[in-house]
Amino acid sequence: MEKLLAKMYEQSESKAEKKQYRVLNALKAAAFLNLAVFYFLYNINVAQGANPAWDYAWWQRLTLWSIVVLCGMTFSQGSNYLKWGLGLLGVGTAISLCTYIFTPQHPIYFGIFTFLGLAYLVVQPIHWWLQKSPGSCGWLLSAIAYDLTRHLTDGVIIWQGKIIGHLPSFLYGDWNVWLGLPGADFVSLEYVPFLPNIFLFLCGLYLFQFMSEHEKGQAY
């Protein structure tokens, strides 16, 4: 009887996770579609001059944040992220080359696809270790790390609205653009550096882990 109940529980758990993944994948697809719509309207309003004063930053920022979090939440459902990571890095490189050649006034360097490629390649080999932390604890630590590092591009570390540290200027330059420490002359229409966004990605990963742990607790 116990084996039968355990098997029924595993089946119901598997069905619940599959349903969660379907919902999350649909949201992720909607987020990428939203990004495509954004660039379509950006091209009309800003690039072509229909409305040069169009305030687009908030829309772009929220869309990129949502993509990073959702990709983190769906990370556990995949397996071959070496292939995905290299593929996304290739897409990001192609986008950078195309914008450099065809729209040099609106280039995209180290955008969302480049970041996701790096995130997949970095997180996959340590995913087993990250899972040792409870979802709630991992999410909290990732959120704190994100908050501490989200102003690195400005050369400061801020905690609860107060500057608690300054980074030396020699750390900033072309060699550290990918990390989140660009030089003063760096320009990119879409910039998603490794820091602080890797912690936002981990927030998504741990949020899904917490949801899964919570459901298992309810089932018991």
Question: Which residues fall in each region the model found?
Answer:
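Alpha-helical transmembrane segments and their immediate juxtamembrane cytosolic regions
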Residues: 1-220
